Amino acid sequence: MATAQTVAIPVVDPYGSVFRLLRSVELPFSLFRVEDASEVEADAPFAILSSYGKADAAVVEELSDRVPTVVYAVQVRANEPAPLMRAMAYVSDRMPVGLIRDVITAAVERASKP
């Protein structure tokens, strides 16, 4: 499999806000936006799934059954538990940018190992 620096990661984001936030994180790989989880190819090395408010467990499960997935949550209330479900990792807009970058990069590296 290609190294993390040579892959393009799909970001499932119907509204585009998470995609814009991720561009500011300066990840060491390319990103491209899709509007629906069904648009992520089964051979994608990895995916980032946006979640506005509470994550949809069914969507997380469906996508993470096909490809390793990180959930990026925005607008989550502090008293709501992080719905990790079957995702590899979970990040939130409340986290520092450096930590978001570290969590996503580590998850991509884990997913790319044979």
What function would you assign to each model-found segment?
Residues 1-30, 96, 101-114:
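Non-catalytic signal-transmission and effector/linker regions of two-component phosphorelay proteins
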Residues 11-12, 49-50, 90:
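Active-site-adjacent beta-strand anchor residues
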Residues 19, 38-69, 73-80:
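Conserved phosphotransfer microenvironments
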Residues 22-24, 59-62, 82-84, 102:
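Short amphipathic alpha-helical segments
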Residues 26-32, 45-46, 66-70, 84-94:
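Active-site regions of enzymes building and remodeling cell-envelope glycoconjugates
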Residues 34-35, 73-114:
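Output/docking surface of receiver
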